[in-house]
Amino acid sequence: MTWLDLPADHPYGIHNLPYGVFSTPGTEPRVGVRVGDHVLDVGACAQQAGMESGAVWLAPSLNAFLAEGRQAWSAARAWLVEQLTNEVHRECVEANLVSVDEVTMHLPVEVADYVDFYASEHHATNVGRIFRPDSEPLTPNWKHLPIGYHGRSGTIVVSGTDVVRPSGQRKPPTEPVPVFGPSVRLDIEAELGFVVGAATRLGEPVALADADEHLFGVVLLNDWSARDLQAWEYVPLGPFLGKSFATSISPWVVTTDALQAARVPLPGQDPEPLPYLHDQPTDDGAGTAYGLDVHVEVDWNGTVVSRPEFRDMYWSPAPSWVGSSCRYGSGSGS
């Protein structure tokens, strides 16, 4: 229970507590935690409480906090819950709550590397039918390992940032040669993005059993896609300018600790992956290869056009990072 006046079903109750970076007029960006319809200025609260690690909350991104690793993340969450449930801390917390209407949200993470995965069988099949109508929609390797490509971390922006329609080469089917101009087939992809915290050393890639130690949290992600540019450029090395002009992410990062109760088993995989990618979870979704009981709703000009369920993903986030070396602040799309 919390002393905060929050409805039991509020999406930003004490069981969530996502992190973000915010500012108020005349102040520098700093770390905050969403609590109900307010943002808790964590740095100010931590300083008043005499926390030695308070400096990480005054930074303009979550990167310094991400670098501290799983033990520090869990300890910080426990401290936050204590602040919000114990009346002893009420005065300090209330003094450092800011209405969400009074803040500007910023990109929560300085993104080090970015990989966009192709983990949904339904999506991969549909895209394959569009781009390769005369071939099998799934390539032979798709069910054997997670497919991804390195995107452009420098064009990841916080949700609400204006997106400029890209220009590039495209080859209309009725034209003998390509033409240059603005994309006429601008598309969206509703995804979850995963934020990596603890880094690995070069040459020591992530193992499946350790993946949870590196995954810090989840954001909503829109993978903007210029389909006409993409279709012309992607052979043989994959997407480039058609997928690298903008990727929008939500300002709030929901931690993997907060999503423990949302873990569910993956759908069956056939053929079974090689052992280094295979970890069969229990019925409660335990293990490292798990799905999430989360759905995304896509509303297009007032009409809901899609409600994809993340639990239906063929590849989960943990196997997707296996074999990679990663830096804190790295991210991936689903």
Give the residues covered by each predicted segment.
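Active-site microenvironments in enzyme catalytic cores
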Residues: 1-24, 34, 40-307, 319
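Glycine-rich N-terminal segment of FAD-binding domains in flavoprotein oxidoreductases
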Residues: 26-28
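Short, surface-exposed charged micro-motifs
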Residues: 31
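Extended C-terminal subregions enriched in glycine
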Residues: 305, 310-313, 318, 323-334
